[in-house]
């Protein structure tokens, strides 16, 4: 422990990371640097600064940064270019936030001369893996302190007792039993875990959802919006250009208004267990559908199918914490190359929990009406050619069947 003189802590200002802050001071006798990232969680972050100061952190060692634009531009959008979904449903809202936080912790560690970084992820979850794989990928010699794998404060009662003894300010909600769920939010989504959600037989309570109205209570009138794309990224809604963070914020508002993006999921964690989580991803759900819509007329068939084949692997890499790995970067290069001609607009219909593409157009379109039409195409497509095409593709199956018959 003696070689760790300074440590950069991913700090939210909440109970857990405040206890970790004090625990690091007590057990490592190290100078603590706090890093708090605004990635759109919707919380006031200045209380984190105030609490850090109360716990003895120097003003120069408190870093609070607005990373919303970087988060959406450099992490969310690249992921959505691949139409990324984990296990058929999950849009990876928590997973994609960890690489950015890890990156900034390492950058701050370099700038401040810290020998170690620390996080508040538990020893049961995926986040410990995501954070630490990022740390080691970006700074191979960094030391990592994961308190939940070291200390004996394994219950809320023990955490509260430690906090009271250490003089850590405790919010009333924690004294009254804590929040009803473990929640994590950023501009892409909000997640809910724990408490009665740990029983997969129990339906989530109606008042749990924060960002979306119930689809049953959504407006009776459908809403149509046009989303413009450039190189696979959304850049404008109804003709109004928006920054990356503004785009996702507005899509969240629209999706939430129409009850879009709710998900109740049992997923397979990288650490081996199954875990239930509920998610609200209104803007991301719209983006996924719209992006597939513009790709449908701009991507070559085999390129589109190759992307689909790679997507599951790409999703697992992000979910499991390998954003900074060479294989994820390699896939990203290919994905980004496919998006060069993904330009145009998509019209989507938002209605009572559903989003559907109803129109799309692009100067780069590969849709040729003269060939695709059911009417007379003037010779653009010779239907007689299909006979030879079919026979050649049936040849191997005909050979196999003839061989079977000869064998009796």
UniProtKB/Swiss-Prot annotation:
UniProt GO molecular function: argininosuccinate synthase activity; ATP binding
Residues reported in the UniProt entry to bind L-citrulline: 90, 95, 126, 130, 182, 191, 267, 279
Cellular component GO terms held in the UniProt record: cytoplasm
SUPFAM superfamilies given in the database record: Adenine nucleotide alpha hydrolases-like (SSF52402), Argininosuccinate synthetase, C-terminal domain (SSF69864)
Pfam (any one): Arginosuc_synth
EC number: 6.3.4.5
Reaction(s) the record says it catalyses: L-citrulline + L-aspartate + ATP = 2-(N(omega)-L-arginino)succinate + AMP + diphosphate + H(+)
Primary localization: cytoplasm
Positions of L-aspartate binding: 122, 126-127
Binding residues for ATP: 10-18, 37, 120
Superkingdom: Bacteria
Subunit structure: Homotetramer.
Protein name (record): Argininosuccinate synthase
Organism encoding this protein: Paraburkholderia phytofirmans (strain DSM 17436 / LMG 22146 / PsJN) (Burkholderia phytofirmans)
């Amino acid at each position: 422990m003696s070689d760790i003189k300074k440590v950069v802590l991913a700090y939210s200002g909440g109970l857990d990371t405040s206890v970790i802050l004090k625990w690091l001071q007590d057990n490592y006798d190290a100078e603590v640097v706090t890093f708090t990232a605004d990635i759109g969680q919707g919380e006031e972050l200045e209380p984190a600064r105030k609490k850090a100061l109360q716990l003895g952190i120097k003003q120069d060692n408190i870093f609070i940064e607005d990373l919303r634009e970087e988060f959406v531009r450099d992490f969310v959008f690249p992921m959505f270019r691949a139409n990324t979904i984990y296990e058929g449903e999950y849009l990876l809202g928590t997973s994609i936030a960890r690489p950015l936080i890890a990156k900034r912790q390492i950058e701050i560690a370099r700038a401040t001369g810290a020998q170690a970084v620390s996080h508040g992820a538990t020893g049961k979850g995926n986040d410990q893996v995501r954070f630490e794989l990022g740390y080691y990928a970006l700074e191979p010699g960094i030391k990592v302190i994961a308190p939940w794998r070291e200390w004996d404060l394994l219950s809320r009662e023990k955490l509260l007792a430690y906090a009271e003894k250490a003089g850590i300010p405790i919010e009333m909600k924690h004294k009254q039993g804590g929040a009803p769920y473990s929640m994590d939010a950023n501009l892409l989504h909000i997640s809910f875990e724990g408490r009665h959600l740990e029983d997969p037989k129990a339906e989530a309570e109606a008042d749990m959802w924060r960002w979306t109205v119930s689809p049953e209570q959504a407006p009776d009138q459908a809403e149509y919006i046009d989303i413009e794309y450039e190189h696979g990224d959304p850049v404008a809604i109804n003709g109004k250009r928006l920054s990356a963070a503004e785009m996702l914020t507005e899509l969240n508002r629209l999706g939430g208004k129409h009850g879009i993006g709710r998900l109740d999921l049992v997923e397979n964690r990288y650490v081996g267990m199954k875990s239930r989580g509920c998610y609200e991803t209104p803007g991301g759900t719209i983006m996924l559908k719209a992006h597939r819509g513009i790709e449908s007329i701009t991507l070559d068939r085999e390129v589109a199918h190759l992307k689909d084949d790679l997507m599951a692997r790409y999703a697992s890499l992000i979910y499991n914490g390998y954003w900074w790995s060479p294989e994820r970067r390699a896939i990203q290069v290919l994905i980004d190359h496919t998006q060069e001609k993904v330009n145009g607009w998509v019209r989507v219909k938002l209605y009572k929990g559903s989003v559907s593409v109803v129109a799309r157009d692009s100067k780069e379109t590969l849709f040729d009406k003269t060939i695709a039409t059911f009417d007379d195409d003037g010779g653009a497509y010779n239907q007689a050619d299909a006979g030879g095409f079919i026979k050649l593709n049936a040849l191997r199956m005909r050979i196999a069947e003839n061989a079977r018959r000869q064998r009796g």
